[in-house]
Amino acid sequence: MAVKIRLKRMGSKRSPFYRIVVADSRSPRDGRFIETVGTYNPVLSPAEVKINEELALKWLQNGAKPSDTVRNLFSSQGILEKFHNAKNSK
């Protein structure tokens, strides 16, 4: 089972709100997911990003592939840097 970390769209029309979820790559965008890792609200002037770092690092270490947008969010929060440092220190 290929696992991805991606955005699940919530909110109403023209007012998007996203949950960052871990899901099977074959499931639909807003379909079934395994676990919620955080949230992303692009509507606010500085976009609000809340991520549970421990869960994100756990899933990255287990082989989950982040989508392009989630990769950008993780790198802006410093999570990818921590992941690469932990991976290279082994």
UniProtKB/Swiss-Prot annotation:
One of its GO terms (cellular component) is small ribosomal subunit. Gene3D superfamilies: 3.30.1320.10. One of its GO terms (biological process) is translation. It holds the Pfam family Ribosomal_S16. GO terms for molecular function: structural constituent of ribosome. Keywords: Ribonucleoprotein, Ribosomal protein. PANTHER family: 30S RIBOSOMAL PROTEIN S16, SMALL RIBOSOMAL SUBUNIT PROTEIN BS16M. Belongs to the bacterial ribosomal protein bS16 family. This is Small ribosomal subunit protein bS16. The gene is rpsP.
